[in-house]
């Protein structure tokens, strides 16, 4: 089948490309919408080849219509696309999708109300009548409607869906696609093939019994004999396939007027499946929020998946989409969505938020944050709030303050910065000028040892007469005695070092 690019050709393709997606919009239908619709039909296990004719589009529309109440946004878009394609096949002039939907509703109502005189002509006119000839009810060579059982391939597809999806919301559209035109016996066969999930099957049986009882209350049995050539009226249990045979089911579905027992039973099953989906999907739409690192596309997928399971009217679901989709997004996407405005489409939202959460977006946010931090720091320092330790720097080249020698603009001084001679640096300078050592004392000393060595001086005795004692003289005498003993001890511990004379000059202890 390929991409189904040959669905429309010539004038029909030109008519297709003139139809707007929405009233008052600028975008029109293109070839890519047909390709997308064909892929979606394959995903729902439908035949994309039905898109080539108006009858096939009508069959697909009847198949998808019951699932619109609980369907996602993608399912509604698929239905709208098929409605426009149906109008193009029938040469119905429409300007946008809304007009196509209105034309489709009018045509369906007209088909339901118009009489079918060809059905009364008998089996000879059966091929030209409006009797359903959908699978599994097919017409044999004699013109009679016979039943053809469901293929094992269809049953296998249904069982595989239930095992993989476990009654997720997408199970309902798949059931509608696989059970198109099926009889109650075929539907019971599909339900009986589900091996697990017996609790869900029991819930489904309870819903079917309730709907059957409601049918019996609304359709009482007419008293009296049944006219010749007619079949009895079906009861609720007959529609469920428990008290009716396959021949009776086929007769009801092909009678004039027909009683679509298969479609009625299918609606009951869909109601039960909706109840099961709510049980298997306990998350509320209010709890679906976008994570800080989650992409907007994944968030939208989770949102619509949960929205499909919500049992609410379409108006309420539209309100949830317009309000909660933006409200529960993360701050980055929320700012972008609010800037788009309330009338933005889902395509515009996903395009605008496409890069949010990726490496490029994270790098851009980090760069903006660093720029703001640097701006705040510079403003903070300019206002005088930065109180650091300010040191006055001095240039060794020119001797001025305020800059370093490597930034000095004056001519470079050659040689030692202290004496001006070449051949050595200032740290190795041996000029006669005295300089302070690392202890802060002037070095070298004029005489004697350096200040970091203990030095002893000759104590001179006073020549004045002794001072009279006034009570505190004894304390001073005691302190003086202790000082003398300490000096004697130091002299015994540190004898004079005469060997240092060659390094430090004359020894003051020998003078």
Curated annotation (Swiss-Prot):
The record marks 135-136, 366-367, 380-381, 437-438, 453-454 as: Cleavage. Residues 118-128 have a biased composition (Low complexity). A motif (Nuclear export signal) lies at residues 16-22. A motif (LYPX(n)L motif) lies at residues 493-503. GO terms for biological process: viral budding via host ESCRT complex; viral translational frameshifting. Residues 107-129, 443-511 are annotated as: Disordered. It holds the Pfam family Gag_p24. One of its GO terms (cellular component) is host cell plasma membrane. It comes from the Viruses. The keyword Lipoprotein applies. GO terms for molecular function: RNA binding; structural molecule activity; zinc ion binding. Capsid protein p24 is phosphorylated. Specific enzymatic cleavages by the viral protease yield mature proteins. The polyprotein is cleaved during and after budding, this process is termed maturation. Keywords: Capsid protein, Host cell membrane, Host cytoplasm, Host membrane, Host nucleus, Host-virus interaction, Lipoprotein, Membrane, Metal-binding, Myristate, Phosphoprotein, Repeat, RNA-binding, Viral budding, Viral budding via the host ESCRT complexes, Viral nucleoprotein, Viral release from host cell, Virion, Zinc, Zinc-finger. A motif (Nuclear localization signal) lies at residues 26-32. Belongs to the primate lentivirus group gag polyprotein family. This is Gag polyprotein.
């Amino acid at each position: 089948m390929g991409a189904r690019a040959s669905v429309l050709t010539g004038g029909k393709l030109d008519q297709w490309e003139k139809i707007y997606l929405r009233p008052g919009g600028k975008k029109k239908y293109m070839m890519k919408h047909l390709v997308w619709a064909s892929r979606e039909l394959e995903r729902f296990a439908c035949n994309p080849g039905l898109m080539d004719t108006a009858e096939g589009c009508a069959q697909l529309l009847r198949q998808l219509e019951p699932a619109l109440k609980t369907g996602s946004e993608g399912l509604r878009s698929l239905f709208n696309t098929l409605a426009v394609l149906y109008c193009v096949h029938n040469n119905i002039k429409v300007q946008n999708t809304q007009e196509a939907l209105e034309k489709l509703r009018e045509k369906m109502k007209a088909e339901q109300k118009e009489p079918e005189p060809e059905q009364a002509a008998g089996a000879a006119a059966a091929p030209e009548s409006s009797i359903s000839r959908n699978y599994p009810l097919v017409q044999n060579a004699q013109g009679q409607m016979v039943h053809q059982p469901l293929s094992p391939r269809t049953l296998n597809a249904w069982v595989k869906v239930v095992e993989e999806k476990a009654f997720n919301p997408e199970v309902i559209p798949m059931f509608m696609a696989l059970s198109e035109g099926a009889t109650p016996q075929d539907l019971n066969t599909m339900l009986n093939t589900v091996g697990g999930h017996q609790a869900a099957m029991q819930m489904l049986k309870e819903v079917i019994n309730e709907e059957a009882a409601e049918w019996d209350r609304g359709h009482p049995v007419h008293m009296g004999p049944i006219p010749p050539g007619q079949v009895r009226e079906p009861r609720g249990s007959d529609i469920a396939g428990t008290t009716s045979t396959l021949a009776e089911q086929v007769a009801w579905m092909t009678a004039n007027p027909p009683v679509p027992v298969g479609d009625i039973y299918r609606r009951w099953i869909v109601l039960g499946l909706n109840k099961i989906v709510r049980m298997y999907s306990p998350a509320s739409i209010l709890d679906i929020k976008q994570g800080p690192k989650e992409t907007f596309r994944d968030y939208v997928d989770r949102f619509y998946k949960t929205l499909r399971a919500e049992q609410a009217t379409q108006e309420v679901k539209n309100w949830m989409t317009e309000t909660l989709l933006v409200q529960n997004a993360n701050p980055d996407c929320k700012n972008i969505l609010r800037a788009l405005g309330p009338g933005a489409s889902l395509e515009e939202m996903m395009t605008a938020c496409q890069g949010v959460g990726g490496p490029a977006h994270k790098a851009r946010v980090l760069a903006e944050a660093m720029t703001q931090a640097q701006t705040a720091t510079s403003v903070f320092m300019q206002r005088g709030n930065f109180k650091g330790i300010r040191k006055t720097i001095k240039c060794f080249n020119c001797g001025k303050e305020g800059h370093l020698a490597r930034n000095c603009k004056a001519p470079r001084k050659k040689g030692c910065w202290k004496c001006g001679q070449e051949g050595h640096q200032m740290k190795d300078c041996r000029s006669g000028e005295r300089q302070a050592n690392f202890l802060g004392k002037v070095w070298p000393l004029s005489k004697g040892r350096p200040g970091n060595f203990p030095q002893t001086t000759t104590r001179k005795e006073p020549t004045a007469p002794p001072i009279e004692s006034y009570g505190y003289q004894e304390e001073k005498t005691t302190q003086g005695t202790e000082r003398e003993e300490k000096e004697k001890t130091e002299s015994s511990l540190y004898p004079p070092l005469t060997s240092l004379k060659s390094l430090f000059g004359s020894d003051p202890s020998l003078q």
